[in-house]
Amino acid sequence: MECPEPSESVIPNDQSTKSCSIKLQPMNRFRDMSKLRNYEIIQKLGQGTFGVVQKARNIKTKELVALKQLINHSAKEGFPITAMREITILKKLNHKNILKIIDMIYEEPKISNPQDILHQRGCFYTVSPYMCSDLVGLLENPNINLEVSHIKCFMEQLLHGIQYIHEQMFLHRDIKAANILIDRNGTLKIADFGLARVYHGSPPKFMSGPGGGERAYTGLVVTRWYRPPELLLGERRYTTAVDMWGIGCVFGELFTRKPILVGKTDSHQAQLIFDLVGPPNSISWSEATSLPNKHDLNIGLTCQRSLESKFAPLMNPDGINLLSGLLTLDPYKRFNALDALNHNYFKNEPLPMKPQELPKFEECHEIDKERFKLLREKKNNIHEANKIPKAHFPKGPGEYNNSNNYPRNRNGSFPLALPKQPKFYNQHQQEAHVPQQMHTDTYIPKKRDDKPGANAPQKESSEPITSYQSLRDRSPRREGHISRKPSTTNSNNISSNSSASNVGGTLSNPTHQKNRPNAKASAGIFMTNSRKQRPKPNPQSSSRNVSDQFKKRKLLPDEQNESDLTDFDEDVKDSKQLDSFLDWDTFTRSPENRKLQHEKKQFETKYS
């Protein structure tokens, strides 16, 4: 009796096989396939619903490849039907913009007990050329900046690939950025045909609408963020337009560097679509009311179109027109691949760059998203650290002073430069209360009483200083210093009227003011209620024409124009001059103030 050939099944109690020695092993039905041991696994590239992708190297040829392990979700299902469809379709397609399968691998299961052979299944791998990047990785990488010519190059290749697929009577049904790969030469390839199907009907032609639509298919296709509105509303007899909607989403994503329609549910996805392209109506999509999920149309009743305003800063009018044609609600009015390829967007400057002219991008895949996210955060932190803070301008009256605990006043709405703090020369001087803002345009001279002794120094007040006059009155002075306006009289002849004026200064004995002769007249000369009534400084009485004791000393560089400080209200026009005036070191060392000190000594000697 002849011994039966080895088969995958085992007959343990068959009487006809008792006299034969049977070797329990499966029949080698995959003898032409490669083995996994022929490849060296380098790293994992990604994982999806239908498989795990790994980067590997052929040990013999040293060629880099991508191994896609086909996942069996249940041991009873056998070979995945999606993988069978993908392999069958890819064997019929041959285009430079479509990813090929160059080999298949079957890895036998490791069986310790021969009785478990029926319950153990091997693993299948598809072998395809290694692609250094995918579109998600390029857009997530902060080191890569895509120019318009680069985007046109990618879009042109993508449209050529999808046009070839539609011509061969296939629907891809899963167009998204993660399924668009780019090799080292800049060639774009469409991958992942696990959801692809043959469609029935005429193929699309130029300006003739989509192809297909003669047969019903499942609606559970296309990733939600790239799913067209007809699928969201329950259309089963869809056309090649479902792929063109996904290409429109990818086109917008190339500019925004992130998905443009990120819905959490199908209803939310429909709302985002209506917010972008406008709600469906009798003009934009007349057949929408006949779809099974037409109740979702109520979501778009309050939506307004925002596509032009959202993408106007990112692309030119031709690009917006192409995007609008690809994202048209009505699938029979939507651009097909031939319509898009003949659009003016690809004919105007800048022209699409050739694939071999594209820059050599670094390797980046979807699995690198977290690494790129950390890199972007690091760059943003460095940018914020080096960012120069902007000046704060008040938004309303009184905001500037209120933010600094100052009460509202006539200068409350003007942000001005802060004056320099005065320098102190001895321990007897106390720090003056210097306001944080002043304004020359709203300055009103402080009214003074003309009675004798009314202008004597008063006690320090806790009220904030809000004018130049109060600043001059309350600021610290060096001991024996008198601040005053220059007199038109000769500086060598110090009269009682000119020397008796003590404007904003301090006297060693304030009681002498009662005995001063003609004090009222002297006060009236220098202290008036109007700026126009103040006497103009006499050029002959400047610091260059004072007594001989001041001419002998050589003026310092910062004292060359000290005469400009004689008329405070006329000369101080901006914050720089204000800072110069409040530089107390320069002010007290000026020749004119030395002259005032000399006059004070003569006054004290005369009335002491």
From Swiss-Prot:
GO BP field: filamentous growth
| Residue spans of biased composition, Basic and acidic residues class | 471-482
Residues forming the catalytic site? 174 (proton acceptor)
Q: Which reaction does it catalyse?
A: L-seryl-[protein] + ATP = O-phospho-L-seryl-[protein] + ADP + H(+); L-threonyl-[protein] + ATP = O-phospho-L-threonyl-[protein] + ADP + H(+); [DNA-directed RNA polymerase] + ATP = phospho-[DNA-directed RNA polymerase] + ADP + H(+)
| GO molecular function, a single term | cyclin-dependent protein serine/threonine kinase activity
- Bias class Polar residues marks the residues at 503-512, 539-548
Transmembrane stretches in the record are none
Q: Ranges of Low complexity compositional bias?
A: 400-411, 487-502
Looking up CDD domains in the UniProt record yields: STKc_BUR1
Alphabetical GO CC annotations of the entry are: nucleus
- Binding locations of ATP: 45-53, 68
What subcellular compartments does it reside in? Nucleus
**What keywords would UniProt list here?**
ATP-binding, Kinase, Nucleotide-binding, Nucleus, Serine/threonine-protein kinase, Transferase
Question: Is Nucleus there in the keyword field?
Answer: yes
Instruction: Tell me the ranges covered by the Protein kinase domain, including all copies.
Output: 39-346
EC number annotated for this UniProt entry: 2.7.11.22, 2.7.11.23
PROSITE patterns, sorted: PROTEIN_KINASE_ATP, PROTEIN_KINASE_DOM, PROTEIN_KINASE_ST
Origin superkingdom: Eukaryota
Composition bias, kind Acidic residues: at what positions? 559-571
Specify whether Transferase is a keyword of the entry: yes
Q: Which intervals of the chain are annotated as region Disordered?
A: 383-419, 443-571
What does this protein's UniProt record list under function?
Answer: Serine/threonine-protein kinase involved in transcription regulation. Phosphorylates the UBC2/RAD6 ubiquitin-conjugating enzyme (E2), leading to monoubiquitination of histone H2B and the silencing of telomeric-associated genes. Also required for histone H3 methylation. Necessary for the recovery from pheromone-induced growth arrest in the cell cycle G1 phase.
As for family, the record states: Belongs to the protein kinase superfamily. CMGC Ser/Thr protein kinase family. CDC2/CDKX subfamily.
Protein name, please?
Answer: Serine/threonine-protein kinase BUR1
Organism this protein belongs to = Debaryomyces hansenii (strain ATCC 36239 / CBS 767 / BCRC 21394 / JCM 1990 / NBRC 0083 / IGC 2968) (Yeast)
- Output the lineage of the source organism: Eukaryota, Fungi, Dikarya, Ascomycota, Saccharomycotina
